[in-house]
Amino acid sequence: MRVLLLTPLFQPEPNHLKGLAFARELVRRGHDVEVLTGFPHYPAGKVYPGYRIRPWMREILDGVPVTRVMMYPSHDRSAVRRTAGYLSLAGTAALLGPPLVARPDVVHVYQGPATLAWPAMVFRMMFGTPYVLDVQDMWPESVTVTGMLSLPGVSAVLGAWSKATYRLARKIIVLSNGYKKCLEARGVPEKKIEVVYNWCDERSLPGETDGEGSDPFGLAGRFNVVYSGNFGALQALGGVLDAAFLIEEKRPDIRFVFVGDGVEESALKKKADGRGQKNVLFIPRQAPESLGRITARADVLLVHLKDDPLARMGIPQKTQASLAAGKPVLLAIRGSAAELAARAGGAWTCRPEDPAALAEAVLGLASLSWNERETMGRRNAEFYRKELAFSIGVGRMTAVFEEAAVRPRRKEGGR
């Protein structure tokens, strides 16, 4: 089977689960794989050294052919620039993709931006190629809830566009049962939708000796509550700082460790510095291997999201990473993520955006014995290996691709 991976990000850009490792695994399983994407610019919005914007270029990464097309690089708060980035990649991929890449049996659309279905629609129209829509963000909510695009009428236009992409897709992959229910409520036939949970970057998992040896960030000897990921509006990390402030005098040995970066980073640091908080540590974004060493010294891994309908439907990727790490997990989130973690047996939940509830939960976890927390972590790791691991997820993805590619071509969509 010849698979085209249509994606807004790809290596060397970080944190893309269905990137190069995914492509290599598909090749290992006997499939021909090609990638159609833009030029690497995430997360800073600047094109990486060694690349320059041009109409198109080809390269081979670990044996996988990658075709990159011209786009406007942006990943900041500007709605105009972000929109230009989304539309430019979709437009040039729609124009240049068909003549540049080998004709696929199926197109996998990593959505991301809903606009990226545009080139897949072109392949469908020109060659009858079916596409599988992998819904990672629910549009239009993902851009309207955050305030990225809040102009009158934008939500209606994006909603209509999204419905068209769902109708024309041969199959739709979603990351949670919450997303599945949402699409069904919007008229997508249940038989078209498959739930495939995301896996995590397993290179970032702590090794057996990662908690030993050098400790460059001074984590030893403290009870570390570690948050790793994006510092954005949806993560609502200001509330985590408030929780840390509430317990600093009660338990000065407890420290909140933030690993990563994002648009809220400066504001968070300013808030912590303004209150003189000593129980907060910010660590820059780390390579997967380095992150594993930090995770090994964590006592609790934190998942925190703003409390809104979009957050309740989805499952942030750090949920899987936290479970796989074999540590107790604290989720300040409701909905699909909390339901998934509850099945693992080693996670606590509390109300999101409630610093007092978060502080109480952290104090409760800190009061448990080491053996109790170790048991929680072991249950989480076992659940990840059996239900969420990379090999399991790729197998489920491949089955969806094969079903999409062999189904008789007929009018798609509708009931």
Map each language-model feature to its residues:
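Nucleotide-activated donor-binding/catalytic signature segment of Leloir-type glycosyltransferases, i.e.
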Residues: 259, 266-292
